[in-house]
Every structure is written in structure tokens, then in C-alpha cells.
Amino acid sequence: MSTHHSPRVVLVTGGAGFIGANFLLRMVPRYPDVQFVNLDALTYAGNPMTLQPIEDAENYTFVHGDIADGALVQRLFDEHDFSTVAHFAAESHVDRSILDPLAFVRTNVVGTATLLDAARRAWTTEGAIDPVAFRFYHISTDEVFGTLGDTGAFDETTPYDPHSPYSASKAGSDHLVRAYADTYGLPVVISNCSNNYGPFQFPEKLIPLMITKARDLAPLPVYGAGENVRDWLHVEDHADAIDLILRDGRNSETYCIGGRAERRNLDVVHTLCDLVDEALGREVGTAREQITFVKDRPGHDFRYAIDAGKLETELGWTRNHTFESGLRATVAWYLANESWLQAVMDQSYRDCVQTQ
């Protein structure tokens, strides 16, 4: 039986964050007949300025609130008759999870459970849930799989082996989603993605952090020797993959989304330095002089890589960005959007980067 899903009313959680906002900026104009309700707590990494291009769209509504607030979530399900949940909301910065793990458990585990149970209650009719009319899509991370050696890649069969409070909380939420599918027949899909980059990312993450510091010729902190390897995925390619999985993915399946762009952290920093120097008309190599190697992060996974073959083969997903073109465009975006950067570089940002 086909499980093609046609969303009518979509609850998007965390839609003011980096990935959720990029998803909404692409989907709201793409699907004018679909209603999108964005529930976001507007924590430090959520920025409503990002959503200004769609804030007056007839098919878009913003709700300020917490996914762990059961009464609020239930009220939204009662009011909006959601057919679909696209669950982005999460605490996601590993360093912060080490400092405050309970905040990650509350949002990533308790918040996910709250949403799952509201969906279960709202979508159950005479003891069953229509597997085509409804869908709960949980967006997750490759960090739940732990670390790789020099070879190999994560895929949908990789065992879970989380090493940080962040990845453990996301692993817990993944298991809850599958448990609701197995126990209650909730129609679910899950995706695990590699590291994202692109416009509107909060500048605590590696790429925007290094762009802003290289611009200012400030010290560029690199963990350990910079040998850790990440697989980089442009956020717009990720958003398009999510759209594809949301509509055509098979119920209870997991899809891995990756960029096939593995790079050592130090190599990424070197490239960013040179791109910033070039864009600002400085001698290439100037920003590299600010690289400072700092004590490695506890439990720092050595290497991530994603095999996205299932998504590419079954659903025909392709990427529109190479890492080289995407990184160049990302540098240009951050250098051109000073007002957006200033809006997020408040005390919460300064407190964050001072610890890095």
C-alpha cells in the first residue's frame, strides 16, 4: 500500500531555529495550499527576524511556546486539526549539553514525548490511526551513532552509540518515536543528518563562528589538532530532502541525509579563512594567523560520515550545492548580513563564544 502523504496542516516545531527556519522559508511559498503553524520557544538560537519574508503569508502562523508544555501542545492540536508534525525543535549544541544536560533531556526527550502523545490522542479514531492521512516526522542527527574510524559511513542499520548528553538525548527521542509507531501505530518517519551549514545559523557553530571571527581577525579556536572529520550538508539541500521524505517516505522508516563532503575541521577553518580574506580584499593567509588550538572537547567524536544511498535510490534525492560552492555562498551571506548577525550577537551569544 502506498504511504504517500499529502500534508494539509503542518505543525512545525522549532521553526525559528536554523534548519526549521530554512525549511519554512522554502516550503511556505512552495505549498500555498498547505497551512504551516510554527511553534517555537525562541530560545537563544531562535530568531524571528529570519522568518520576516514569510511572516505575513496567509498560510503561515507563528506560536510562541514550549514543546514540553503539554496543555499548550494539546490546545494547538485541538485548534488546528494537524495532519502532520515536522519536529525540528531541539537543543543541539554539544558544548552546552555538557554544561547543562538536563535542559537537553527536557526539550529533546520530554518535549518529543509530549508531541508524540498529543498526536496519538488527536489522530486515533476507533482505536486506529490512518497511516496515510497523518504523519509524524522526527528530524534527528548522525551523532546518535557515535564515532567512526578512518573508513566507513553511517547508514540506516548502524547501531546507536551516543557519546554526549546531546546525542544521548536525541537517541532517546528517536527511540520514543519508534516506540509510538510500534505500540500505537503512529505513522512516523525519522531522518538522521550530517552537519548542516548555510544562512541563518546561530554563530556558536563551527562555520559561522569562524566566519565572524575571521572577519574581525579574532582568535579562531580549534579543538585539539583539528583532525576531527565531519560530513557537511547545505541546509537548503537538507530542507528539500525533508520535504521529499515527509511526502514520499515509507512509514516507520529511517533515512540518512548527508552531503558526501567529508572534511577535517582544520581544513574547513583554513578554507573559511581564505574565503573571508579574499572577500574582504586582504592578503590570503591573514586570518589563518589567528588559529588557536584549544583543549579538546570531552567525548569529542573523531569522524562522522553519512551514506545517503537509500534516500538517493528510493526517493531520487539529489543535492544542489557542492561543498565548495555552498561554503563560498555562505561566507558571502554572513559578510553581507551584518544586521542579522548583530541581532543575534547579544549577551547570550557573547557568553557562549567566550567559552570556546
Predicted segments with their positions:
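N-terminal Rossmann-like NAD(P)+-binding domain of SDR-like oxidoreductases, especially those catalyzing
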Residues: 1-196, 329, 334-355
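C-terminal substrate-binding subdomain of Rossmann-fold SDR/epimerase-dehydratase oxidoreductases
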Residues: 9-11, 23, 36, 65-68, ...
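Short histidine/acidic/glycine/proline-rich micro-motifs that form metal-
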Residues: 42, 195-198, 228-229, 297-298
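Short aromatic-enriched loop/helix-cap "lid" or pocket-rim segments at secondary-structure transitions
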Residues: 48-51, 148-151, 201-204, 235, ...
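Residue-level recognition of oxygen-bearing side chains
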Residues: 72, 103, 110, 202-206, ...
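The catalytic Tyr-centered alpha-helix of NAD(P)H-dependent dehydrogenases
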Residues: 162-169, 199, 203, 207, ...
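Hydrophobic alpha-helix immediately C-terminal to the catalytic Tyr-X-X-X-Lys motif of short-chain
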Residues: 172, 176, 180, 210, ...
